[in-house]
Regions:
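Amphipathic alpha-helical polymerization modules
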Residues: 1-126
């Protein structure tokens, strides 16, 4: 019963989904960085609507059934370069740093939840 309640809690489910999304975003940002000098390359990222849609699902309590987002071409990104590549190294590095920080925070939350479960099962704190 305790185990079921932990893994079915809204916060835990949301954290898992956000970890998956952060992993996917990291892959996209890494791809952007790898293609910073590729002529014609267009940056990819999670859809701009992802955060709002995720928040709406949280409020509605339907986060467990949310589909995993897909990386999409960032149509809002403009190119200042003649070769058509719209990746800006500074912006990508900032986005990557922010994404890593968010991932670390989520990992700490999930890890803390699992530590509480282990403590409840074993009765020990270590």
């Amino acid at each position: 019963m305790i185990i079921e309640s932990l893994f079915s809690s809204k916060n835990y489910q949301a954290s898992k989904k956000l970890l998956d999304a952060a992993t996917l975003r990291h892959e996209g940002l890494a791809t952007n960085l790898a293609n910073v000098e590729t002529p014609g390359y267009k940056r990819v990222d999670l859809p701009k609507t992802f955060a709002a849609e995720f928040a709406a699902r949280m409020r509605a309590g339907t986060i467990a059934t949310a589909a995993m987002p897909k990386l999409t071409e960032d149509l809002a990104a403009t190119s200042q370069r003649k070769d058509g590549n719209n990746v800006e190294l500074d912006k990508e590095l900032l986005a990557l740093g922010k994404n890593v920080s968010e991932y670390d925070t989520l990992t700490e939350f999930v890890s803390g939840s699992l530590k509480q479960l282990r403590m409840a099962i074993t009765g020990r704190t270590t």
